[in-house]
Amino acid sequence: MCESRSWLYFTVLVVFVAQAAVAADVVPTEVDMPGTQPGEVGNLESPSRCDNCHAGYNNESTAVAGQGAPQDEPFTGWQGGPMANAGRDPIFWATLAIAEQDFDGAGDLCLRCHSQGGWYGGRSTPTDGSGLATSDSDGVDCDGCHLMTNSDNSEHVGVMVSPFIANCVADPLLPDKSCDSAGEGFYGNGMLSLWGGSEKMGPYADADARHPFLQSRFNRNVDFCGSCHDVSNPVVGDLAPNNGKQHKAPHVVSSQDYYNGVANLGGPREEKAAFNNPPYAYGIVERTFSEYKASALPTTRVSAFQTLPEDLRVVGGSLEVTYQAALAAGTEGDYADGEERFFSCQSCHMRPVTSAGANKNGLQIRPDLARHDHAGGNYWLVDMIQYQQAHSLLRFGEGVTDSHLAQLAAGRARAVEHLRQAASLVVDSDFLKIINLTGHKLITGYPEGRRMWLNIKWRGPGGALLREDGAYGPLFNENGEPVLVENPAGGPDVQVESILEPDSPNVRIYEAHYAITSEWAATLIASGKSPDLARSYDRPDDEVTMSLGEMASQPA
């Protein structure tokens, strides 16, 4: 087997602890970030208002007639997708709890995207999410996108009040700071610039909306999606000795620049990294958007699909399916209004369909309505929500409706479909070639919860199984005893399932490997963090294999 493997280097999401971990009522300046702030826009509406018009009008008859299926309705597709359910994600809530233990107030960063309505409505403090309303579980809601303006102020100008300006206009350029140009917006971390008027925004010039409306070209811009899908840790960005940046990356301006290289915990926000640098520059956590921007796809028109390398033109692969969906609009791959369509985030994750956008009489059937399902690969989210709903374990107790559950099931199927489109495998003699058919790294996004591996079964004469590499199944400890965890719904403990022999030389696992420097570990200890804090564990017995103190003693 021949394999090309690239390692991803991340700064561990570990931050200063100044006191016992309790939810913060005031967001620390290290966690504060630019963009529209809570309470600054008063025109936010519940998604239930959008449901009145943007769902419930497509049916079997319209689908047969080629005029749209129920899943093509904006609200219906959204309701079954990951964005609508970001505030219900149990992994999010578990991660939020851990972040709050590490740094009091860190949860504000998480809630900014996972509960947009709650954050902009001023309910994100206490920062453990205990102040949120039940309706805030809708996650990334309609107004979060349809009030978003470009933070570089190149089109409609959203609400941003100094010092919360999410662009480089007031910042010196390289080499003094990491901005490339004075017009560069801060795209990442949910630092949105929201429109303060009553209009909803969308990409069409001819929308016959029954509410105030403005055309926004930003809705088709890839920076629109980048506004959330580069995630950086602003605390690491400001306080860590290397600011959590890539090796040899440009200098990151932080509070350390004001105090002779010493971080100023709790200092003015104007000194902090998040207020002086684009988010891709510091505190690396997730880089889906940056991965995409580093590829050739942002400048490749969908109509140029046939010029792509043969390996990428796999029938049924992500790029080919996107190409076919765009062709159906009848404009050789471009938008129906003549605008050039590139292999953008929207082209792949909001593929065009033929449907009306609302239930009002006389609305045109558009050949390139963007499907609002935002499908990715996270099908397991639906499994968890369904389980918690069935056992009354959802974070917000009122649960979800039967209709919502049906949309979740449909969303799960779309996520599985996207996973199948993401890669192709080519076997040539004793070589296996893995081809990435996505616009970013093949595993991307949340690095603590994503991995990919090869499950290879070697068979002999008659199909007899000779060996299996990368097998997945129930775990046992070194004594042959089942590895069990507590059943959250009560009843018998549950045996853990995972990759059975992850350290075997024949097993290929692709995942992010975290790392911190010894200087960062020493800085954490100097700030009051216990040197006994576990940094790594044995699997599956949970024995500590390295502490923070041991990490700090490693050579620089």
How would you label these PLM feature ranges?
Residues 1-10:
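Bacterial N-terminal signal peptides that target proteins for export
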Residues 9-19:
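Bacterial N-terminal signal peptides
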Residues 24-64:
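N-terminal module-boundary/linker segments of secreted carbohydrate-active enzymes
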Residues 25-33, 60-95, 127-556:
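Primarily the internal scaffold of c-type cytochrome electron-transfer domains
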Residues 43-48, 103, 107, 137-139, ...:
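Residues immediately within or flanking Cys/His clusters that coordinate Zn2+
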Residues 50-53, 110-113, 142, 225, ...:
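Short cysteine-rich clusters marking metal-coordination/redox-active sites
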Residues 97-103:
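Membrane helical hairpin/interfacial module
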Residues 107, 112-124:
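Conserved, well-structured interaction surfaces
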